[in-house]
Amino acid sequence: MSTDSLPRSLMEQKAMELQQQLQALLDEIDQNKQESENISRESEYLCQYIGSMMAFQNRQTVPKK
C-alpha cells in the first residue's frame, strides 16, 4: 500500500507508534548494556577472588623443608 493513499492523521499515528517502539528498543539496549557492564565487573571480581584463593591454597600445600 502506497503512503500516498493513507490519510495524514494515520501516517502521523504510525510515525508516533514507530517512534515509541524505537524508544523502547533504545531503552532496552541501555538496560542490557548496564547489565552487561555489571556482569563484567562481577566476573572480574570473581576471577580475582578465585585467583587469590588458589594462591592461598598453594601456599598452604607447599611442603616445608
From Swiss-Prot:
Gene Ontology CC annotation, any one: cytoplasm
Domain of life: Eukaryota
Coiled coil: 8-44
Gene3D superfamilies: 1.20.5.170
Keyword check for Ligase: no
Classification via Pfam families: DUF2205
One GO biological process term: vesicle-mediated transport
Alphabetic keyword roster: Coiled coil
Similarity field: Belongs to the SLO1 family.
Record-given protein name: SCOCO-like protein 1
Taxonomic source organism: Schizosaccharomyces pombe (strain 972 / ATCC 24843) (Fission yeast)
